[in-house]
Amino acid sequence: MTKEIKADAKTRMDKAIDVLSRELAKLRAGRANPALLDRVTVEYYGAQTPLNQLASVTVPEARLLLITPYDKTAVASIEKAILKSDLGLTPSNDGQVIRIAIPPLTEERRKDLVRLVSKTAEESKVAVRNIRRDANDELKKLQKDGEMTEDELRSATDDIQKLTDTYVAKIDEKAKQKEQEIIEV
């Protein structure tokens, strides 16, 4: 039973790391990254459609995104959606494709992004700690029900704590990498 609790905690912590990775990928670090446009939805034939379903997004250069719509009639709608998004990007349209030049970040924007990275990392740490608390509660319930001894409980909670420490260290590492990426000019 304790193995199942540990495995469940590990799976949930892996998911927390995945969420953090996706959130950090969305932050603009002065480099072009197709994930920047993941949240953009386009008005297409009366329905809000994710951009990645209407076009391919590629990175031909470090500071350039190239959006190639599958349907050329959607070019204007895609451009409008990008302008309306809160990304602060300005698309240029040649009728076939849309190019987005990623401007270099200002010092103030870099500081804001570093704060946002720290906040996002802290939220992930809280999620991991909540998972630890849930696992420990389940273990204590097993011990209370007489399914495990006090020593087994202590050993299992120590294992959960080690797992938590490992995942918190992974979160710190990912946050540090993203901060370095943002700070580099």
Curated annotation (Swiss-Prot):
GO biological process, one term: translational termination
Pfam families documented for this protein: RRF
Subcellular location: Cytoplasm
InterPro entries for this protein: Ribosome_recyc_fac, Ribosome_recyc_fac_dom, RRF_sf
Highest taxon, organism lineage: Bacteria
Molecular function via GO: ribosomal large subunit binding
Keyword vocabulary terms for this entry: Cytoplasm, Protein biosynthesis
UniProt cross-references to Gene3D superfamilies, sorted A to Z: 3.30.1360.40, Ribosome-recycling factor (1.10.132.20)
Annotated S-S bridges: none
Protein's UniProt keywords contain Cytoplasm: yes
GO cellular component: cytoplasm
HAMAP family linked to this entry: RRF
Function of the protein: Responsible for the release of ribosomes from messenger RNA at the termination of protein biosynthesis. May increase the efficiency of translation by recycling ribosomes from one round of translation to another.
Family the entry assigns: Belongs to the RRF family.
Name of the protein in its database record: Ribosome-recycling factor
Protein source organism: Shouchella clausii (strain KSM-K16) (Alkalihalobacillus clausii)
Lineage: Bacteria, Bacillati, Bacillota, Bacilli, Bacillales
Name of the encoding gene: frr
